[in-house]
UniProtKB/Swiss-Prot annotation:
Family classification: Belongs to the vitamin-B12 independent methionine synthase family.
Record has Zinc as a keyword: yes
Gene Ontology molecular-function annotations: 5-methyltetrahydropteroyltriglutamate-homocysteine S-methyltransferase activity; zinc ion binding
UniProt cofactor(s): Zn(2+)
Keyword Disulfide bond: no
Role noted for this protein: Catalyzes the transfer of a methyl group from 5-methyltetrahydrofolate to homocysteine resulting in methionine formation.
Enzyme Commission numbers on file: 2.1.1.14
One annotated GO biological process: methionine biosynthetic process
Record's catalysed reaction(s): 5-methyltetrahydropteroyltri-L-glutamate + L-homocysteine = tetrahydropteroyltri-L-glutamate + L-methionine
Protein's gene: metE
The protein, known as: 5-methyltetrahydropteroyltriglutamate--homocysteine methyltransferase
Cleaved signal peptide residues: none
Keywords: Amino-acid biosynthesis, Metal-binding, Methionine biosynthesis, Methyltransferase, Repeat, Transferase, Zinc
Length: 760
């Protein structure tokens, strides 16, 4: 019996972000489209070769995207938004939908980009499909068929991947009122029929149809729609219905009634679902077991996975397939590009290329290959050794974790009492003005950081340069007459990576890039051991900045949940335990900052909402420990120390209780683009603490007028008492230039002063 092995997708960016650099050259008009397309073709061929050389049964095609796979599906279906449609869609059309008005060289006229949002609970973003009642669908964009043909010509056994019709509809949005996008399903299915027919004509035997929404708690109408959809698109091609990111426990009874040929489940995210799925699997169906985690960087315990799957193999025989849990696009590409890692640390990891090998090796072991079984056992040994390593599981950190009690999460005084202390100590006016933390990261800063990291600039010289940038930021803020200043974060390349580099327990990489959206890639740090703060991190910079001014200087920290969500977590302990370790480290930083004379400390938590589990029934438990982690970090603050937090979401209603439970003295939020509508959640809740609704959209180069800012502040004052309002931009100003920043902040300060005079 031979076990079929495959992956759900492979990273499309290239080992060293080749696609990113080619895209951006094309957008700048520096290369022709033919050169860009050649880069893509080379990457695809290399990806398929990686899968074939490892011994996988299939090479997956259709996982490559020039910008985003959902956007690729939009063009495949001939569903280009009308404002971007210009005859037959081409690559420039695709970029225009994803990016909006593009730079010269792409032939793209001005039009707004489609919305972008998170792909389920990952850090990848997709371009949101737009639906209106008159929409039609027709197979238009040939990329899928061309890539299948290319792979076949290269001799690969091809398994195309396609985003399913229900998930495609569900992940989009209606752009007309009184219209339900689900009513478009019959029209959409006609296009899917045509796609599957074309694939059959190309000689494809199996197609992977991704329906990740089957892992959600679906409304009945969406769950019921699956049976109709899959009856209509049934064809000569065998369908592997693919789910990931959570269990199918809520939808399994509907799934097993569908006219498909197999089911893929994510046994990394939800290992507990295996027994129920095996029990209910229809006769003759394939079960694709997603046991190699596609969302992390950790080596798989192949020995344990073999033992777990062997009874399933004995029962299902060749109908058990072995796979990655989800697409490997969420993993870095190749661990072999990290020679600076120690042999021990390297033995803990597997990036996408290594995960392909894991899948193939596990398949051979399940087939009874004695050598493969021995290799699995040897391969798994570093994972077992790591579990007992004292430098990974540190007794003193564990002891501190075990000492956490409810009292550790509470400030020493309630908000009303703290507010009185803070008013006396801080001496701030009505409608105090501040910024969110970062100031423009100029080319000079980036060049100096690069020189320091490459050893061309000494530590002393680099620190002197940073102090110069901090002094410049303080001077500019004083000239603007802002009430609460920040040091500008010149020393930070990234709000999470900076803390990861300065806390024990993290590992950073050189080429550990993963795609976030389009050409944007991120390089998450990896939690490899118990986390602790061995020395102060931000105190030197904040106290230096405070020494330059008589105004209040705000200390700037990234919160524990955000650091957790934007890094690769450990798999051997819970996310809660990691968050608590981070919280204790940040608690010490808060304590040191206030002892050094910093009276206002901001703990940013932009990712609390992003960390929500996919199933709503799991939200309460997550929010409880997420809130507790923030409170542990903040609770070392004395009553007179003012704790701020910052969040940038488009929706607060479902988490407003938890936002209030953070008990931050001041929360700043992103509201300018919503025209203050987001404040309604805080108004309805009767939010008790102070709030700074953003009045300057930092994502736009436009300079808001003083009158516009005044109107926004007035609207905010209709919902929140002016005595509890702050005036600030939406977010940090890292991506803006100084001329834009100073012009906008001058108007912000003037508007606040004018209204302050009217209200006093």
């Amino acid at each position: 019996m031979t076990t079929t092995t495959h992956i759900l997708g492979y990273p499309r960016i290239g080992e060293k972000r080749e696609l990113k650099f080619a895209q951006e050259k094309y957008w700048r008009g520096e290369i022709e489209q033919t050169e860009l397309k050649q880069v893509g073709a080379t990457l695809r061929e290399k990806n398929w070769a990686t899968q074939a050389e490892a011994g996988l049964s299939f090479a997956t095609a259709g996982d490559f995207a020039w910008y985003d796979h959902v956007l690729t599906t939009t063009l495949l279906l001939g569903h280009t938004p009308k404002r971007h449609a210009n005859g037959f869609p081409d690559l420039d059309t695709l970029f225009k939908v994803g990016r909006g008005q593009s730079q010269a060289g792409c032939g793209c006229s001005g039009a707004a980009a489609s919305d972008m949002t998170k792909w389920f609970n990952t850090n990848y973003h997709y371009i949101v499909p737009e639906f209106s009642k008159d929409d039609s669908f027709e197979v238009s964009w040939p990329q899928l068929f061309e890539e299948v043909n290319d792979a076949i010509k290269l001799g690969h056994n091809v398994k195309p991947v396609l985003l399913g019709p229900l998930s495609y509809l569900y992940l989009g949005k209606e752009i007309e009122e009184d219209f339900d996008r689900l009513t478009l399903l019959p029209r959409l299915l006609t296009a899917y029929q045509a796609i599957l027919s074309k694939l059959a004509n190309q000689g494809v035997e199996w197609v992977q149809i991704d329906e990740p929404i089957l892992s959600l708690e679906l409304e009945e109408k969406w769950g019921d729609a699956f049976k109709l959809a899959y009856q209509v698109i049934r064809s000569d091609v065998k369908v592997l219905l693919t789910t990931y990111f959570d269990s199918v426990s809520d939808t399994l009874d509907k799934i097993v009634e569908l006219p498909v040929d197999g089911l893929h489940i994510d046994l990394s995210a939800s290992p507990e679902q295996l027994d129920e799925v095996v029990e209910k699997l229809p006769q003759g169906w394939v079960l694709s077991a997603g046991v190699v985690n596609g969302r992390n960087v950790w080596r798989s315990d192949l020995s344990a996975q073999r033992e777990r799957l062997q009874p399933v193999k004995d029962k299902l025989g060749d109908n058990l397939w072995v796979a990655s849990s989800c697409s490997l696009l969420h993993s870095p590409v190749d661990l072999d590009l990290e020679p600076a890692l120690s042999d021990e640390v390297k033995s803990w990891f597997a990036f996408a290329k290594q995960k392909v090998t894991e899948v193939a090796l596990l398949g051979r072991a399940l087939d009874g290959d004695h050598n493969a079984i021995l290799v699995c056992d040897t391969y798994s040994q570093p994972i077992k050794d790591r579990k007992t390593a004292a430098h990974v599981n540190k007794p003193h950190v564990q002891a501190r974790l075990n000492s956490i009690s409810a009292s550790l999460t509470e400030r020493s005084a309630p908000y009303a009492e703290r507010a009185a202390h803070q008013a006396e100590v801080l001496g701030l006016p009505l409608l105090p003005t501040t910024t969110i933390g970062s100031f423009p990261q100029t080319s000079e800063i980036r060049v100096q950081r690069s020189a320091f990291r490459s050893g061309q600039l000494s530590t002393d010289d680099y620190h002197q340069a940073l102090k110069g940038h901090i002094a410049d930021a303080v001077r500019r803020q004083e000239a603007l007459d802002l009430d609460v200043l920040v040091h500008g974060e010149a020393e930070r390349n990234d709000m999470v990576e900076y803390f990861a580099e300065n806390l024990a327990g993290f590992q950073t990489t050189k080429f550990g890039w993963v795609q976030s959206y389009g050409s944007r890639c991120v390089k998450p740090a990896i939690v490899v051991a118990d986390i602790e703060r061995e020395k102060p991190i931000t105190v030197e910079w904040s106290t230096y900045a405070q020494s330059l001014t008589n105004k209040q200087m705000k200390g700037m920290l990234t919160g524990p949940v955000t650091i957790l969500c934007w890094t690769f977590p450990r798999e051997d302990i819970t996310r809660k335990a990691i968050a608590d370790q981070l919280a204790l480290a940040l608690r010490d930083e808060v304590s040191d900052l206030q002892q050094a004379g910093i009276n206002i400390i901001q703990i940013d938590e932009p990712a609390i909402r992003e960390g929500l589990p996919l199933k709503k029934r799991d939200h309460k438990a997550y929010l409880q420990w997420a809130v507790d982690a923030f409170k542990i970090a903040a609770a070392s603050a004395k009553p007179e120390t003012q704790i701020h937090t910052h969040m940038c979401y488009s929706e607060f209603n479902e988490i407003i209780d938890s936002v209030a439970a953070l008990d931050a003295d001041v929360i700043t939020i992103e509201t300018s683009r919503s025209n203050m509508e987001l404040l309604k959640a805080f108004e309805d809740f009767n939010y008790p603490n102070e709030i700074g609704p953003g009045v300057y959209d930092i994502h736009s180069p436009n300079i808001p007028s003083e009158e516009w800012i005044e109107e926004l502040i007035k609207k905010a004052a209709e919902k929140i008492p002016a005595q509890r309002l702050w005036v600030n931009p939406d977010c940090g100003l890292k991506t803006r230039n100084w001329s834009e920043t100073e012009a906008a902040l001058a108007n912000l300060v003037s508007a606040a002063k004018k209204l302050r005079a009217e209200l006093v």
